[in-house]
Regions:
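Nucleotide-sugar donor-binding/catalytic module of glycosyltransferases
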Residues: 1-172
Length: 172
């Protein structure tokens, strides 16, 4: 494995997230791992200061952050597709621009699990949901520990996006 190999690509899509994007990026940068990772940010032509914030981080962390600015608004799915396509790591982790990670060992724990358990193509966990318009935090305890197949994941929407780490380029 070369020294410039990224084990994980963190895929972050963002549009008009100026109030949240710095915290989302900081949650990725605080990760403590024994492997290299990259942060690929798909900035979708925001009309607020989201792009400027992303550019400042990309300038400060050029070895970690790959900023993909768009010259016109693509929409969520096209932006997600182009950002995911730019991810070159063995694994992809998702964290959108209005989400953030609180556990500095999140990536290490999930990659350790996937490396020890080759029959799994992804791993996810419960999350704490904070909505600034609601007084209480919500724990996503609807996610039951267990093994899920593709059909269960797609039909039951059991995966909190920001908790997911999965194998890149898995054939389905």
């Amino acid at each position: 494995m070369s020294s410039d190999y990224n084990m994980v690509s963190v895929c972050m899509i963002t549009y008009n997230h100026e109030a949240y994007i710095a915290q989302a990026i900081e949650g990725v940068l605080m990760q403590k791992t024994n492997f290299r990772f990259e942060l690929v940010i798909g900035e979708d032509c925001s009309t607020d200061s989201t792009r400027r914030i992303c550019e400042r981080y990309a300038d400060r962390y050029p070895d970690i952050i790959n900023l993909l600015p768009s010259e016109k608004n693509l929409g969520m799915m096209p932006n997600a597709n182009r950002t995911t396509d730019a991810c070159k790591g063995k694994y992809i982790a998702l964290c959108e621009g209005d989400d953030y990670w609180t556990d500095p060992l999140k990536l290490q724990k999930q990659v350790d699990f996937l490396e020890r358990n080759k029959k799994f193509s992804g791993v996810f966990h419960n999350v704490l949901i904070i909505n600034e318009n609601l007084p209480d935090k919500i724990d996503s305890t609807t996610v039951r520990a267990g093994i899920y197949n593709q059909k269960e994941i797609y039909l039951n929407n059991v995966v909190p996006t920001l908790s997911l780490v999965f194998c890149n380029k898995v054939s389905i």
